[in-house]
Amino acid sequence: MAKIDTTSRLTSLRGFMKERNVQVYIIPSEDSHSSEYIADCDARREHISGFTGSAGCAVVTLETAALATDGRYFNQAAAQLDSNWTLLKQGLQDVPTWQEWSAEQSSGGKNVGVDPSLISGATAKNLAEKIRKSGGAELVPIEGNLVDLVWGKERPARPSEKVIVQPDELAGESVTNKLTKLRQELEKKRSPGFLVSMLDEIAWLFNLRGNDIPFNPVFFSYAIVTPDVATLYIDDSKLDDKCRSHLSANKVEIKPYDSILDDARKLHASVSEKGKSENAAPTGNFLISNKGSWALKRALGGDSSVDEIRSPVGDAKAIKSEAELVGMRACHVRDGAALIQYFAWLEDQLVNKKATLDEVEAADKLEELRSQKSDFVGLSFPTISSTGANAAIIHYGPERGSCATIDPEAIYLCDSGAQYHDGTTDTTRTLHFGTPTEAEREAYTLVLKGHIALDQAVFPKGTTGFALDGLARQHLWKNGLDYRHGTGHGVGSFLNVHEGPIGIGTRVQFAEVALAPGNVLSNEPGYYEDGKYGIRIENIVVVKEIKTKHKFGDKPFLGFEHVTMVPYCRNLIDTKLLTSEEKEWLNAYNAKVVDKTQGYFEGDDVTLAWLKRETAQVE
């Protein structure tokens, strides 16, 4: 991973900071919609720092610069940041958060600047309080992004790809029904409206899909839903006649994307004016998501006029319709078949044919095999194809032309996924094509045991992913081992591969939302030896109600249904470490994989032989 000399970029940025009288400037990773994955034109933190990971925040003062990121990216950030930068390893003891570091730098009456469209209103409020307590001046909303000024004419144009309709038979629910349910939420809160800013929520709400952000079938847009009107803010050039007809049939108005702030101000003025009327019924505040930007909150009137809530659209989206669940099961079988073909091909090339393949060449083959499956649209994220020590970099990204050659005598980790019209996939398998060490086999088996434990979990309704996280880590913990990432994330239906608000892990938000039937999320424990190897095993699971002998407190009990259909690496399993119950689970899983996928391999002797060996009975 090459370092970029950021000296001139930082010098230029500091010049613009001085012009606006800010001594500290914050550059988040997200775009104006709080997206995790962003378009190239919004990669501001990457441009100023040289760090390409998907999560992190840069903070620049007139003398220093710091980059904060989490444990998934410690190795990558250390490799990519040049000497201008200090790495803040979030989550480690005595390491300040980027908010704390920003506030510390503001002491002595310094101003802290930020683009108000890139942080949430809640974050801005908390940060302003920290700045005040640290002796700083204030948090200043800087209209016009300063990194964009540094970037200049080299900044990529904003994408404007066409939008398509997601048919009701795949979505499982009409736009009209979704809007009716949202308006019922507004009525409960006596709210005059909800502003939707998350791109995947808008795509889901209006049964549309786009292609503005790589790997994520979303499109740049906002929406405002009131008791009477639903308005989609989108560039008109994105819509064809079919989309316009679809929106019209569902009584959705269309307005220009760039008019959202003006309309938000007008809405605030209108609601305020109505509230002054003697005969007006009392109303609550306008609603925005707690991930909605500070700019949107300010336009709607600020704290006194706006309530920031967990998005009811996001909550509804996380509980998949029956049609979406049917699609998720089906696409994971097709996707599993592609992965089985890939792993069989890769082993044949490396071991039998003694071929030389680098990480990207292998990933290209996997994409080719996936593209041959029905309803394939594209990848759901860049394939993590990693050999040996590269596998220890949790979100490693091989670079074409300069990546490593796959070593058959080292661990190979492949984390990959695809977008299909009927669902989104995300699967990780760790393999070894030679002779693994005892330490590697032990670590792999401990990870597998945690993976199985979570898959078999049964828990009462109301349980959160926060409460389940330890199940996946327990066998690692018993041996003094652990991993620095979450155990599970929500997955969209032909939408973002990372989807909130649910998840399994130690993040605070995972303790706030209980898992519910219809949730789709990942089960992906791991273990990483820096500079040596990495192990991760990932399946996608569906939350469902489980029949139990008793029902304590008259509560239903829930569990998981795995939909991923790919064998585990037989070469890395130390069966002596497995209990009889775990072996039984593994045999049942393997039998299901064979039953669901073998029909794809007629006449493919290499794949059939590989599948037979990898799914052989564990005694």
UniProtKB/Swiss-Prot annotation:
Catalyzes the removal of a penultimate prolyl residue from the N-termini of peptides. PANTHER family: XAA-PRO AMINOPEPTIDASE 1. PROSITE patterns: PROLINE_PEPTIDASE (PS00491). Pfam families: Creatinase_N, Creatinase_N_2, Peptidase_M24, Peptidase_M24_C. Binds 2 manganese ions per subunit. Keywords: Aminopeptidase, Hydrolase, Manganese, Metal-binding, Metalloprotease, Protease. Its EC number is 3.4.11.9. Mn(2+) 2 binds at D415, D426, E538. GO terms for molecular function: metal ion binding; metalloaminopeptidase activity. One of its GO terms (cellular component) is cytoplasm. It comes from the Eukaryota. Its cofactor is Mn(2+). It comes from Fusarium vanettenii (strain ATCC MYA-4622 / CBS 123669 / FGSC 9596 / NRRL 45880 / 77-13-4). It catalyses: Release of any N-terminal amino acid, including proline, that is linked to proline, even from a dipeptide or tripeptide. Mn(2+) 1 binds at D426, E524, E538. The gene is AMPP. Coiled coil: none annotated. The keyword Metal-binding applies. This is Probable Xaa-Pro aminopeptidase P. GO terms for biological process: proteolysis. Belongs to the peptidase M24B family.
